[in-house]
């Protein structure tokens, strides 16, 4: 039972990471602003995502803190679609579950231990360190739709090939990693940051809807209503209200909501700051998992 709760918690980490997976001013503006994904060709940008959540599985509480740090450079722009070269710079997770403290960090120790918590932490730290500082490519249109992600699958394959583990264990790890870390995984993770734009001029009070779906073991549909709350110089503050739902054939069910504020630089579409609260319930394999989380996203131009 202890093992199943631990596995479910780690699996939930990757699922919730996806949902994760969102200066100066010249005074309040009464006029509208064009709002679209408009990162500049030849420029670089950094994103930092922090997710702090509490889960409850069969009356067992789990505390998880997730950190992701990314850098991107816009290498091409055909007027409609931007090509972006991206790298994970650091990945970390601290988890307290069933009385065990599990720490995973791409910059931390990857030493293995007989202790189950340290062994898992060391193994996943190896996974994280094998992914960072390796570029992959993303194509994004002006509404923030992620059209294509390429190169991440090769990063995962290379990382697994470099690990000194038995062939049977490698095959199992490969099957798991292909589901948790893949081109589609990256696409799902960044959809919430990029897929927010109406691609038109907006004024305070305007509303629009955006939706996207995630794949994998815990696929879900995300439907968000965005409201323009304030325009201050070039910066637009949005209120986001998201409904989360799914019903898979295997019986997995996800329901939830997420609310928050997003500050966007209208000149580029860079998400300068975003803070949100999430409440979600996942039912899988007869177990019910309640999730209450807070997330922060910060973007900066290099």
Model-derived regions, located:
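C-terminal motif of bacterial Sec signal peptides marking the signal peptidase cleavage site
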Residues: 19-22
């Amino acid at each position: 039972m202890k093992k199943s709760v631990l596995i479910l918690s780690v699996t939930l980490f990757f699922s919730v990471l996806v949902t994760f997976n969102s200066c100066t001013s010249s005074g309040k503006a009464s006029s509208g602003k064009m709002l679209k994904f408009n990162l500049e060709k030849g420029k670089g940008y950094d994103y930092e995502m922090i997710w702090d959540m509490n889960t409850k599985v069969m009356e067992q509480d789990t505390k998880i803190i997730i950190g992701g740090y990314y850098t991107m450079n816009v290498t091409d722009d055909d007027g409609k679609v931007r090509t972006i070269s991206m790298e994970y710079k650091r990945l970390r997770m601290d988890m307290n579950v069933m009385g065990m403290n599990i720490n995973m960090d791409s910059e931390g120790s990857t030493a293995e231990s007989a202790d189950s918590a340290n062994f898992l932490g060391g193994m996943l730290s190896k996974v994280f360190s094998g992914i960072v500082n390796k570029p992959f490519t993303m194509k994004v249109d002006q509404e923030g739709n992620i059209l294509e992600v390429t190169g991440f699958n090769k990063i995962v394959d290379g990382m697994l090939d470099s690990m000194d583990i038995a062939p049977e264990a490698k095959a199992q790890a490969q099957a798991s990693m292909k589901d948790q870390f893949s081109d589609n995984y990256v696409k799902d993770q960044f959809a919430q940051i990029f897929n927010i734009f109406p691609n038109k001029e907006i004024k305070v009070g305007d509303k629009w809807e955006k939706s996207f779906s995630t794949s994998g073991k815990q696929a879900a549909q995300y439907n968000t209503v965005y409201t323009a709350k304030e325009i201050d110089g070039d910066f637009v503050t949005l209120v986001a209200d998201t409904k989360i739902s799914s019903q898979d054939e295997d019986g997995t069910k996800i329901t939830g909501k997420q609310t928050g504020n997003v500050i966007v630089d209208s000149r580029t579409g860079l998400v300068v700051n975003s803070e949100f609260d999430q409440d979600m319930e996942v039912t899988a394999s007869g177990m019910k998992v309640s999730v209450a989380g807070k997330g922060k996203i910060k973007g900066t131009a290099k």
